[in-house]
């Protein structure tokens, strides 16, 4: 039985304002989720406007198919394929705005069967698209100590990465133990491995669960490819509006927008003529305003918005 979950879109008004919607414009919502941003964009489009939304989660696709609107098209796939989809629909250089709402939607987190959360027992899966790729349980069953440590440290920024990885490997190698296939098993294992001096407000498993989710879904590679694809398909003055949810994502977005706004960097002392420097290219984008965080009121209404950051850039 499928449960019904409420999903509150984060920084909804701010991210849509960042797109500077034109009624007859062409827009792409790279992360449909449960459609909060997409429906808001559609409400601001006129009869000639178009919205293309992307998601690789079958549940999100099912939700999108409820939208009966000739201006709307849903694409099933990873948002890293945005440039490919733009070519398919002849949109390259014509897109007036792209929105990315990174991270996991509330229904994904709240549905125990998806295996994203340590708060509810469920299969240890964590795949954004359950029809492809390897679940976390299968990866943990074969990964070595160094690989598990690296993933937790790199993508979870957890200072106890080695300690947690050792606990997982030791558990796995004990033939008396059940296979590690449930979120509750992994959460308890990590909690037990945490030092008694653990002081953080967050659950001890928070960072490790984040790390495994990012790794199993290749999230950072997806984001990097998606950002570059979005820059390539935007029309002049087209906007890129990106909401991130943790420091790894936000650093990627910040560095990307800074790099695109600076153009090629030529080291001092390299003897190049002005023509040669111009041939290297120029800045592709400019940042719009400052990074925005949710208001105290939004955080109170939706605690999951607390860590979110919105950044906006415009194609030159």
Curated annotation (Swiss-Prot):
Q: Does the keyword Membrane apply?
A: no
| Gene Ontology biological process terms in this record | rRNA base methylation
Detail which positions bind S-adenosyl-L-methionine.
35-37, 55, 79, 101, 108
EC number(s) stated in the UniProt entry for this protein: 2.1.1.199
Stretches the record annotates as Disordered = 291-316
Compartments where found? Cytoplasm
Spell out the family assignment given in the record's similarity comment.
Answer: Belongs to the methyltransferase superfamily. RsmH family.
- Briefly state the protein's biological role: Specifically methylates the N4 position of cytidine in position 1402 (C1402) of 16S rRNA.
Q: Which PANTHER family match?
A: 12S RRNA N4-METHYLCYTIDINE METHYLTRANSFERASE, S-ADENOSYL-METHYLTRANSFERASE MRAW
Q: Please report the name of this protein according to its UniProt entry.
A: Ribosomal RNA small subunit methyltransferase H
Q: What is the species of this protein?
A: Vibrio cholerae serotype O1 (strain ATCC 39315 / El Tor Inaba N16961)
